């Protein structure tokens, strides 16, 4: 059995179970977070098609990510979470799937859904099994403890990281995800993670972030890429963002911003900041 051990415990988030739970709960109760703890184990509401959370260290983006997971907690528990993020390392394939085994965090193990992953590979024509793209990547790893806090180990994952940020890849993955749900009846939610603009002064960074969030809410994946290109927005995950938007379009659902902040709002350091979204689709 393949095991992916945590690569960023102790850096992006605490390395011990006790401290990690405290950090997650602090994210929920933080002034920039939802302000309350989530319902654990799943709720009775309608689950979203997709979410777009950030993926920085918990001390920076944890409170904004918590808005996503609070909202998720109100809906019925998914059996499968398709995790989609940007590949920051440059290793691996254009779209890399970790296809079997388990992922570990300080909160325990989560099983990879091999059959759902196989279907995404088949349907997308671009996603392929590849461990190398995942070994040191943080964008998906930081989502797992939040999911484990909600559901324990009672869900499976399909982890995909995208190296080539293109509209075509976004559309292919979104359509594969749509078929997974609609043709195969898989009770799944897509968690497509990206940070927003990077490393500009507070006001300029915020201006670019709000332009991108407006494009996301339009519900058109092409508008996401056009806005990023037209305004030189350095979001790290255009493909995950656009895939979530396209998944919503296919299901007849428009994105809705749950929360937004940047690192300057958290730390008070505004010389250069990074933007963090929380979006429900």
UniProtKB/Swiss-Prot annotation:
Transmembrane segments: none annotated. Belongs to the MEMO1 family. PANTHER family: PROTEIN MEMO1. This is MEMO1 family protein APE_1771. It comes from Aeropyrum pernix (strain ATCC 700893 / DSM 11879 / JCM 9820 / NBRC 100138 / K1). The lineage of its organism: Archaea, Thermoproteota, Thermoprotei, Desulfurococcales, Desulfurococcaceae.
């Amino acid at each position: 059995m393949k095991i992916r051990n945590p690569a960023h415990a102790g850096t992006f988030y605490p390395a011990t179970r006790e401290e990690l739970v405290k950090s997650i709960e602090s994210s929920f109760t933080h002034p920039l977070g939802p302000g309350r703890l989530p319902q654990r184990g799943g709720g009775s509401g309608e689950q979203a098609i997709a979410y777009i959370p950030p993926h920085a260290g918990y001390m920076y983006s944890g409170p904004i990510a918590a808005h996503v997971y609070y909202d998720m907690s109100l809906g019925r528990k998914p059996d499968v979470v398709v995790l989609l993020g940007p590949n920051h390392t440059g290793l691996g394939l254009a779209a890399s799937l970790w296809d079997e085994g388990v992922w570990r965090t300080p909160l325990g193990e989560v099983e990879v859904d091999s059959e759902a992953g196989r279907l995404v590979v088949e349907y997308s024509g671009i996603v392929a099994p590849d461990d190398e793209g995942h070994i040191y990547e943080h964008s998906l790893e930081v989502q797992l403890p939040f999911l484990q806090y909600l559901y324990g180990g009672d869900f499976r994952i399909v982890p995909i990281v995208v190296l080539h940020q293109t509209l075509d890849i976004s559309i292919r993955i979104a359509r594969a995800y749509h078929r997974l749900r609609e043709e195969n009846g898989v009770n799944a939610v897509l968690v497509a993670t990206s940070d927003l603009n990077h490393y500009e002064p507070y006001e300029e960074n915020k201006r670019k972030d709000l332009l991108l969030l407006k494009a996301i809410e339009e519900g058109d994946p092409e508008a996401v890429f056009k806005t990023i290109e037209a305004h030189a927005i350095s979001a790290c995950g255009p493909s995950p963002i656009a895939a979530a938007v396209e998944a919503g379009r296919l299901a007849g659902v428009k994105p809705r911003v749950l929360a937004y902040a940047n690192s300057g709002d958290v730390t008070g350091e505004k010389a250069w900041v990074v933007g963090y979204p929380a979006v429900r689709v």
